[in-house]
A protein has these predicted regions:
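Low-complexity, intrinsically disordered
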Residues: 145, 164-180, 206
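Amphipathic alpha-helical coiled-coil segments and their boundaries
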Residues: 39, 46, 50-53, 70, ...
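Short, charged beta-turn/beta-strand-edge "cap" motif at the junction between a beta-strand
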Residues: 45-46, 173-177, 219
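Structural microfeature recognizing short secondary-structure transition sites
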Residues: 123-124, 178-219
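Extended amphipathic alpha-helical segments
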Residues: 1, 48, 52-63, 86-115
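Surface-exposed patches in structured soluble domains
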Residues: 4, 22-25, 31-37, 108, ...
């Protein structure tokens, strides 16, 4: 059967703000470890935004205290303020809005550095330093090349001969070594063409690439 190799783990990573890219630490094909730094944005504007929002939040907290004290509550213990009264006081003081803006600014700062979510290989990295980050598309993709799987189909009348765990041999059409694997998933649905989708885990030692066309033989 004809099949295609796909990575079991794949993550499209993107920046959440369009600041200028300051540093790129990796390139396509590099192997990275979970938690490894991939790229940074210029953080000057983000730092200013975070500092300003933090100041605004502190000011709103003081305003909130003034509102509650003005209503006769003790500044030493606001735990006795009724929930509805506290809700209205937070709106009047601008506390909730200031807190929301601070949390957003804090998140933007935390996401100004891209980190590898798992061990894998870098792919589809085309951005360059000193250019604004494009938030509408992925900055790069991390592929878990150790955990590859072959997606293929079999005829419905062949389904009775396939079981979970059955051995398979994967041969790339591009040539080279054949690799062994085992059936890991059988989709319990026959499509309009009388075909059933099957997946097989492949132990390729990093020698197969996602998207490769292969021939799959079930043993």
């Amino acid at each position: 059967s004809n099949g295609k190799i796909n990575a079991r783990g794949k993550a499209d990573l993107r920046f959440e703000t369009g600041e200028v890219i300051a540093h790129i630490y990796v390139k396509n094909g590099d192997r990275v470890q979970k938690g490894q730094k991939l790229a940074d944005l210029d953080k000057f504007r983000l730092e200013q935004k975070l500092s300003q929002s933090e100041d605004a939040l502190l000011k709103a907290e003081l305003e909130l205290k003034d509102v509650l004290i003005g209503q006769g509550y003790s500044p030493d213990d606001f735990s006795k303020v009724p929930a509805e009264t506290m809700k209205i006081a937070k709106v009047k003081s601008g506390y909730e809005q200031s807190k929301s803006q601070y949390e957003l600014a804090k998140r933007d700062m935390e996401h100004a550095t891209l980190i590898a979510p798992f061990d894998g290989v870098v792919a589809n990295l085309f951005s360059k330093p000193y250019n604004p980050a494009n938030i509408s598309e992925a900055f790069c993709t991390i592929i878990d090349s150790k955990g590859m799987e072959a997606d293929f189909t079999v005829l419905e009348n062949e389904l009775a001969f396939i079981r979970m765990g059955d051995k398979v041999v994967i041969t790339p059409y591009a040539g080279g070594d054949a690799f062994e694997g085992s059936v890991s998933e059988i989709n319990p649905l026959v499509d309009a063409n009388g075909m059933v989708k099957v997946k097989a885990l492949v132990n390729a030692g990093g020698k197969l690439f996602s998207g490769m066309n292969v021939r799959v033989s079930v043993r």
